[in-house]
Amino acid sequence: MNLHEKYKNLKNIIKDYGNLAVAFSGGVDSAFLLKTAFDVLGDRVMAVTARLCFCPDRELKEAIEFCEKEKIRHIFCDVEILESEAIAQNPTNRCYLCKNEILNKIKQAVEPFDFKYIAEGSNADDSKYYRPGFQAVTEHKIKSPLKEAGLSKSEIRELSKELGLPTWNKQSYACLASRFVYGDKIIAEKLVIIDKAEQFLIDLGFSQIRVRIHGSIARIEINPDEFAKIIKPEISREIYAELKLLGFSYVTLDLLGYRFGSMDEEILKK
């Protein structure tokens, strides 16, 4: 199928649901899914966003703004994720444990509204990556219509652009827990530090960024085409000074640049 045939198929899949609650993070995939569902089902669609310390405030703000602009009903559920010691210990299946907890809360939040289905934004590319969280999606019988329609991330961006969505060129985001080495305990204060460090780099004009934490070392990942900018003495000194203030002893640049799931690389070797 070509792109627009896939899009038509997606709309037919959604139409068959009758009504739908969409787990909405504000990212590229869930925004496109939510908009498409709203175009098909109208007020029989509702967005539900989980609020938790793994998600930066800027992501929540953008999710709220999106729903307000599109006039889509939007509710929230609060997830005290670090109350789970199993998740805080950051095992290799953390993503599964976390997703399971989030989906439990989302289902509880949606229950009073009598929606037949809940959908989430996994796409056809996600099966290529280490995604233990998808096991929880399957176990909770959550729908993944983008994946079912065979839409890739690049195709979702293209269709989002055609629909005029502000998220079409939004950089990919992963929860802040992914900045920790597996086995290193996730601490709320460190999440705040990482969020501030990444926001600082965003404010300097860097696009796709991650600040990974290795004890007292900050490992910065950015797109390689921005290396020339970050190694300028005035920029590198400013970054070093700011991250030192945040509590890091050493600040490093990953020479491979940004890549999805770099903390998973050692796991995938096994």
Q: Language-model segments: what does each one mean?
A:
Residues 213-215, 219-232:
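A short interface-forming secondary-structure element
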Residues 103, 187-194, 232-236:
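Generic alpha-helical secondary structure
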Residues 19, 95, 181, 223-225:
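A broad detector of the eukaryotic-type serine/threonine protein kinase catalytic domain
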Residues 1-162, 203, 218, 234-248, ...:
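ATP-dependent adenylation/nucleotidyltransferase module used to activate substrates
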Residues 207-214, 254:
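C-terminal boundary motif of the adenylate-forming
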Residues 261-270:
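Short, low-order "capping/linker" segments at domain edges
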Residues 118, 147-153, 157-201, 207-209:
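Mid-to-C-terminal catalytic subdomains of enzymes
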Residues 254-261:
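A short, acidic, flexible beta-alpha connecting loop/helix-capping segment that sits on the rim
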